[in-house]
Amino acid sequence: HLHCLEAMQIANDFRLSLIPIVEKEAVYLGAVTVNDLLQAIGKIVGVRDAGAVIVLEMEQRNFSFSELSRIVESNDAQVAQLNTYWEPQSERLIVTIKINKFEVSDIINAFQRYEYPVKYYFGEELYENELRSNYEHLMNYLNI
């Protein structure tokens, strides 16, 4: 039995659109399509789960699941999903966090307060935070 991530790696390595399923005795049982694998991986990463996504970029030595989780949980949310990958161009770790609520203003502010660079996010921000940000941009512009 292969995990869907292993099957996806095989499909990618050999550029397959269909992966045959065989028993040890080479008896053909059926096939799995790449689309089937994408749907399975989508379930694993919670594509359809409600909530916001926050993407951080950091040095690998600064990554601490417990610290990131503590920051999220201290803002009345929970980590529903956390994935990481190494970005060779920037030589930094990209951390994608899915949380169980859409409003992210307090969590974004907390990450910034603890000096975790927020690369981007998909969620809702309170109107007052947008207003404050626009005001700060205007003041910076007027000071130029």
What kind of feature is each model-predicted range?
Residues 1-15, 22-23, 38-46, 64-75:
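The conserved cystathionine-beta-synthase
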Residues 17-19, 95:
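Conserved beta-strand core positions
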Residues 41, 50-144:
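A conserved regulatory-domain signal marking ACT and ACT-like small-molecule sensing domains
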